[in-house]
Amino acid sequence: MDEKGSPRKKSRSISYGKWGYLFIAPFFLAYLVFSLIPLISTFYNSFFERYMVGLDLIGPTFVGLENYYSLFTQGDFSKYLSNTFIIWILGFVPQLLVSLLLAAWFTDLRLRLRASGFFKTVIYMPNLIMAAAFSMLFYTIFADAGPVNSVLMSMGMESPYRFLANIGSTRGLIALMNFLMWYGNTTILLMAAIMGIDPSLFEAAQIDGASSPQIFRQVTLPLIKPILIYVMITSLIGGIQMFDVPQILTNGNGNPNRTSMTLVMYLNKHLFSENFGMGGAVSVILFLISAVLSLIVFYSFTGKMQRGGNKA
Amino acid sequence: MNSRAKNAAQRSLSVRRVFCYIFLILLTFLSLFSFYILVINATRSHPDIQKGFSFLPGKSLIFNLKNLFTNQNLPVLSSLRNSLFISACTALVGTYFSAMTAFGIHAYNFRFKKFAFAFIMMVMLVPTQVSALGFVRLMSTMGLRNSFIPLILPSVAAPIVFFFMKQYMESTLPIEIIEAARIDGSNEFHTFNRIVLPIMKPAMAVQAIFMFVASWNNYFMPALLLDSSNKKTLPILIAQLRSADFMKFDMGQVYTLVAIAIVPVIIVYLLLSKFIVRGVALGSVKG
C-alpha cells in the first residue's frame, strides 16, 4: 500500500497530491476555528484580569502571570487537583485489576467460559449511559430516603446512612460510577490486545507445562504492555476531565466541603461566573498536564506502529 | 501425563470456572442493579416510591409519563427533540468528514501528509475543556450562543473517529480500487462518495453510533452554550432537576425522566451490542 516503492508510481501520485489537501481541508479548517483559535484566545485571556462584579465588568487589564500566582496561592487549586487525583485512583485501580482478570478469563483457551457474550454485553453497557443521568440516578438511589437506605433500614439499621454528607462515601460513589462506566471498555481493549498475540506463544508455554497464572504473568502481561500504557494514560487524561458525575451528584458544589470538587468543575465555575482570567489560567494548567501525558502516549503509539507497520 | 494428574487438572479447572462465574455474576449485579431500580421506579408513583423499595414494577408508567410531559417547568418534549437533532447531525457530519480526512491521508501522497497525521494524533488527547473558554467567547461574538451549530460543526474535526477510519481503510481499502476508478474516469470526490463510502459502511455505522451516543450524553458544552429554555438538551434538564428544590419533586417523574435519557440508548445497545463491542476492539491499537 505504500506508494514510495516505484518511481513511476510516485510521479503519478504527485499529480493527485492536491486532492489530499482538499480531502483533509475540512478537518483542519474546523479544527482551526473551533479548537485552535479558542485555545489561543484562552491562553491570551489567562494573562488578563477580567471578571464581573454584579453587572459591572472589571478589566480586561493585563496582569501577566498574576492569575497563575493567585491560583496557586489563594485558591484551592491544589486541593482540587488532589481531589481529582484521589477519585481517579479510587476508580482506576480496581478498574484495571478487574479488567485484566476478565480479559484473561474471556481469552483463556482452557477455561472456555459459557455465556461470555452475555457478560461482555452487560459489562460494556454502563459505558454508553449518560453520565448526567447516571449520577442523577445514583443521587436518588443513595439519597437519605432512597432505595439503598430503605433496604439498609429494613435490614435493621437505625438511621439512614448519609452517603453524600461523608467525604469517603461521596468520593467512593464517584469512583464506583467511574469504575462501572469504564471497566467494560478497558476489558474489551485488553481482550483485543491479548487476542492479537501470536497463539503459538501460548501453545509453546502450555507444552512447557506453564500454568494459566504463569502464562498470564510471563507471556501475556509483557506483550500487552503498550496497550496497558495506552489504557493507563487515556484513563488519566479522562480522569483529569472528570466533570459530569461529580457535578450532578454534588450539584456543582463538590460536597462535603468541596472535597469532591474536580479541576473541570472548578473551571466550569469560572466560566459560568465569567471570570475569564482565572478560567484561562486553570485551562492552561489543564492543557499543560494533558499535553505532557499526550506526548508520552504519542511516543508509545508511534513506537508501536513502526514495529507493527507492515501488518496491514 | 497420567490419568490421575489429568483428573486433578480437570477438577482444578472446574473449581476455577465456578469462581469465575460467581465473580462475573457479582459484577453483572453491580452493573445492572441501578438500572433495575431505575426501570422499576419509573413505573411506580410518588407515594409508592416513598413507601420503600420494591422488586416488582408498579402500574404508574403512563401516569408518570403524562405528568412529565405536561410539566410546565420541564420542557421534556422540546429537549428530547433538541437532543435527537443535535446527536443525529453530529453523527452524520462527524462520520462523513472523518472518513473524508482519513481517505485524504490514506489515498494520497502530499508534502505535509506525515505532519498532518502526526498533528491529528497530537490533538487527539487534548481535552476539549481546555479551549472551552475561548470557544464559548468566540461563539458568543459570532452570535452563535443558543444555536446548535457550535455543538454540531466541531465534530468535523473528530480525531478519534478519524483514527478509527484510517485503521479500517488500511485493512479494507486497497489503492488499486481507487486507481481502477480513475481509469474509468471517475472524479476523486465521486470515487469517495460512490466507492469508498460503501466499502466503509461497517466502520461508519459503528462510529455513527458512538458519536450519536457521545453527543446525546454531552453535558459540559451544551450547558455553557444553551440557556434559552426551548434550546435545552436532556442532560441540561437533568442537571436542572438536580439543582431544583429536590424534596418537592414527584419522584415518579424524576425516575421517568432519567429513564427517558438512558433507556433508548440501552435498547439500541442491546440490539447492536455485537457491532459495538467489536467496534471498540477494532478501534484499539492492535498488537
Predicted regions and their residues:
Chain B
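N-terminal Lys/Arg-rich, disordered targeting/topogenic segments
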Residues: 1-6
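A structural signal for multi-pass alpha-helical bundles of membrane permease subunits
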Residues: 8, 12, 16-287
